[in-house]
Amino acid sequence: LYTGSDGIFIPLTGEANVSENCAPATLAFNMCHEAAHRLGIAAEEEANFAAFMACSASDDPNFAYSGYYRAFVACFNALAENYPSLAEQLLSVDNVTDEKVLVIRDMLQTSDHYTAYSGTVSEAGQAVNDAYLKTFGQQEGTQSYGEWVDYLIAWRAALSDAS
């Protein structure tokens, strides 16, 4: 039974859990996200950014890929929401590279993976998670998961400024 959540941190016990039903490309990132909560990073967007930083600094290619994959998907989703034609152009056949094919394949597999679990239980789980986050101070609820794109942009700009 999948409730639409890839992980949960239980503050009372300090226990971080990652769902066995999460998509393979997201597993390492999800592990780092929940570990970030365990280390005291409560805000979802901050836990996402911390997970990205941990994954991207890892020598393990699975962790590094998972971090960059999730960062790409978050940025792509923000682009698609605000500039759909640019997002379409980014994925166009004219811009195909081996790396892009791998990422697109994983995006499609991840989408198929979660679509298989969609339904009443998943919707109820997302509603509960949204209420839970709002109760504990995340005003944007589940929308806060995507807000880490601002952190990624600021981090990348800081790297460029330092060069």
Identify the meaning behind each predicted range.
Residues 99-163:
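Pan-zinc metallopeptidase signature
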